[in-house]
């Protein structure tokens, strides 16, 4: 009897918690060139928040931070799959073995871009040639 009572109490709580979990929806409105590298796409809705001309990291040449509502999901934990597919369609190869948490690396020819995905923001960094990362 206690098993059934526990199931009757726990199941609705589980379903309630599942229903209250925020759902990540990737913004899809087209893409435009980033200010860091003309060949690297960013979402059309991306608004430039800050340019980073002289980063503190010696492996980074320059960067830019963009506000993109809805990207990254809650706490930046959701990978924007359609966006990554667009980056790859533009000729960039994801260096999955180099990923560090929120930072993803993409390479095209001799250029390496680090893309930091956070909740509602993207930061695009161009790495220096022969960067150690």
Label for each model-derived stretch:
Residues 23-71:
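Compositionally biased P/S/T/G-rich terminal and signal peptide-adjacent segments
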